[in-house]
Structures are given as structure tokens and as C-alpha cells.
């Protein structure tokens, strides 16, 4: 009997040691399924077959610290969010806005940066909106599943400023911007981070900007233990290191 108790205690002790050596959470000790949309520079994009970006650097730093590995799957924007809701993915990141409708079906990390929403147009069109009174005269495009649609539904449409049926939806920013250049759409909604990149590549300009209404975070399935540990990591590296990563990609 004593031998059985000893062996049971020994097994329990070994299990506790093994668990402690797995990382700071069970989730962090295994391969993490990551959903992304690799057409959202500078937050997430592909270059020469390699995944890069601000969000990637933040989560890569987490995995290096915790000893986990990422298995990255690319989706369109709506598919990426769907992978989190259905729990096919453990986390999603590509410059994702934290919104109330999304918080009902997924959990978010603490915000890691503030963001603006920019309506951009081609410079040769010279569309400049002093206010939103004339917005209804233009077609607007953006990727399916973006927070802009909720904004139009809850803020603009009830005030008679813009209707959701005027919107043209696309798989990603790439297709929306192609139609913008071809004159198939008047303006495209871009995150401020994304707009900062495409201004260097395309002759676009801001037609209207919403400041202070958006914060970006990492998306997790409801009840995720990984989210809490990632938040802990963000606290551990502190605001200065987080800002250094942001500054690296926002140059």
C-alpha cells in the first residue's frame, strides 16, 4: 500500500514538473493554429513567400518567449474571422479592429495600437469631403467582413448619410484598390495603417478620415486561455518595446 502511495505521489510530482516545463499555459506548449489575411500591410503581408508584418512580429515574439510554434493559414478577411468563431484557429491577426459586434462572438487581446479609418480616392479625382453631406453621391469599396460595414449600419445609415446597399465588397484590399484605379469605385475604406503603406505605392489621397474611433487587437475564440497569456506577454514586454515594433513597420 505504501509503495502504491509512493508511486502515485511520484507520478503526480512528475506530471506537475512536466506541466511546468510546457510553457506558461497549456495552449502555449503546442502548435498554435493562426488565421491571417496576408494583404493588410504593414500589419500582415507576404513578401517573397515569407509572412511579415507588425502583428506577425508581436506574435512571433510571444511564441519565441513561450516556446510555441505557429501554423499559419491564409484566408480572405471574412474567412479569417470565421476561423476564429468556429475555433478552427486559435488566434487571428492582420490589423483586426475591436468592435462590439465582434466581441459578442470572439475574445480580443488588450488593444496594442490605435488606428484611424481613411476613405481614400485617386488623386486625379480630387475627391475631398469637408463633411459627410455628399458621401451618398459616391460608391465605396472594402473587403467583406471589415468593421466598416458595422459602422455604416449603426452610425451612417440611421442618419441618412450612407446606405449599405451602396457598398461594393471585395475579398481583400488588393481587389478593392484595383477597382479604385480602374474607376469602378469612387473611394475605398482603408485602415490608417494600411493607407500609410499604399500612399507610397499608388497615387491616392485621403478624402475623409475618422480619428480616434478604432483600436486593434488579436482575436481569439470565446473562452480562450491563450488570450490571457498573450495579454500577460504584452504586459511583460511593456509599452516601449511594443511601440518600437510599431515604429519599425510604420516608417
Which role fits each region the language model picked out?
Residues 17-21:
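C-terminal motif of bacterial Sec signal peptides marking the signal peptidase cleavage site
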Residues 27-96, 169:
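Extracytoplasmic small-molecule ligand-binding "clamshell" domains
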Residues 65, 73-74, 78-91, 105-107, ...:
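Short helices/loops that flank or line small-molecule/ion binding pockets
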Residues 56-65, 123-147, 217-251:
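Extended ligand-binding regions for polar small-molecule ligands
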Residues 25, 69-71, 147-168, 202-209, ...:
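Ligand-binding clefts/hinges and TM-proximal coupling segments of bilobed small-molecule sensing domains
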Residues 94-105, 153-154, 178-212:
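A ligand-binding cleft/hinge motif common to bilobed small-molecule-binding domains
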Residues 37-39, 114-121, 192-235, 251:
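Periplasmic-binding protein-like
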Residues 35-40, 73-78, 87-99, 115, ...:
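Beta->alpha turn/N-cap motifs
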